[in-house]
């Protein structure tokens, strides 16, 4: 009998203790902090129903940069029961930066670096252009002084052999129309000589002759073309059919101009 009474008393005491602890647990909320190893540590005794923001300045994680960081977790409702409360999920914890000094310094360094690259490239290009422009400007200035002051007899002028020997005598195709009065017009395909050849003039010479070269036909044929006319007589035209052209040199007297005879009965059309 006494044993039964003792058992009942012990059960009543245990029930009272559990009810008190349970009511105490409802008023209290669990707070969590982050230790140096990155694990959550549960702390009791806080009166607020939310997860405290923990300063993680001392963390040595590789993904954490400069500045102070905080951890934000979901708020826990204080009306939940003890069995429904759960530990905060790490997937729902977000890491954010509260100080932007590191980002500002990085942006400032990138801006200064880009400015240095731009100015150094511009200065380098400017030096290169100055180096390439100096010889041309110097030659132009020397030629200007020679023309203004008069070149002395012993002055030597530099010239490139490639520019002197460069000739451009080309054979260009064109359409030639051969016409005559009271005759039908005839159209043929021919070539003409066009280009630049070398000419040499030496002053104060006794013979006063110039050595000139002209772009002339070097290979050609003479064709006799008969025109269809209304009269009883047929008209025959002799036309030079040009195949190749070259620069040919010849000597001429001073102030003598070359004379070119052109048949008025032929017209040129490119």
UniProtKB/Swiss-Prot annotation:
Pfam families: DAN (PF03045). Disulfide bonds join 169-215, 183-229, 193-245, 197-247. Residues 169-253 form the CTCK domain. GO terms for biological process: anterior/posterior axis specification; cell differentiation; cell surface receptor signaling pathway; determination of dorsal identity; determination of heart left/right asymmetry; extracellular negative regulation of signal transduction; gastrulation; heart development. Residues 1-20 form the signal peptide. Induction: By nodal/nr-1 signaling and wnt8 signaling including the downstream effectors mix-A/mix.1 and siamois acting synergistically with either lhx1/lim1 or otx2. Also by acvr1b/alk4. The long chain interacts with nodal/nr-1, bmp4 and wnt8, thereby inhibiting their function. The short chain interacts with nodal/nr-1 but not bmp4 or wnt8. GO terms for molecular function: BMP binding; morphogen activity; nodal binding; Wnt-protein binding. It is found in: Secreted. Inhibits wnt, nodal/nr-1 and bmp signaling in the embryo to promote head formation and anterior neural induction. Within the endoderm, acts as an essential mediator of nodal/nr-1-induced cardiogenesis in the overlying mesoderm. Belongs to the DAN family. Keywords: Cleavage on pair of basic residues, Developmental protein, Differentiation, Disulfide bond, Gastrulation, Glycoprotein, Neurogenesis, Secreted, Signal, Wnt signaling pathway. This is Cerberus.
């Amino acid at each position: 009998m006494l044993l039964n009474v003792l058992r009942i008393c012990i059960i009543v005491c245990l029930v009272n203790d559990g009810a008190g602890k349970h009511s105490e647990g409802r008023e209290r909320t669990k707070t969590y902090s982050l230790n140096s190893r990155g694990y959550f540590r549960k702390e009791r005794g806080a009166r607020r129903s939310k997860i405290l923001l923990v300063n993680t300045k001392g963390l040595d994680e590789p993904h954490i940069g400069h500045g102070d960081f905080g951890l934000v977790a979901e708020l826990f409702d204080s009306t939940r029961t003890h069995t429904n409360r759960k530990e905060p999920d790490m997937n729902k914890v977000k890491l954010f930066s509260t100080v932007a000094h590191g980002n500002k310094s990085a942006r400032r360094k990138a801006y200064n670096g880009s400015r240095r690259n731009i100015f150094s490239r511009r200065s380098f290009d400017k030096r290169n252009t100055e180096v390439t422009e100096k010889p041309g400007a110097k030659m132009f200035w020397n030629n200007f002084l020679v023309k203004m002051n008069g070149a002395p007899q012993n002055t030597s002028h530099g010239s490139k052999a490639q520019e002197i020997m460069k000739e451009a005598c080309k054979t260009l195709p064109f359409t030639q129309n051969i016409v005559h009065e009271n005759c039908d017009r005839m159209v043929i395909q021919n070539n003409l000589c066009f280009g630049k050849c070398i000419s040499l003039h030496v002053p104060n010479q006794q013979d006063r002759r110039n050595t000139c070269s002209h772009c002339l036909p070097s290979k050609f044929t003479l064709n006799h073309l008969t025109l269809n006319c209304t009269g009883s007589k047929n008209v025959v035209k002799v036309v030079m059919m040009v195949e190749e052209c070259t620069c040919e040199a010849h000597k001429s007297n001073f102030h003598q101009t070359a004379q070119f005879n052109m048949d008025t009965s032929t017209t040129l059309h490119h």
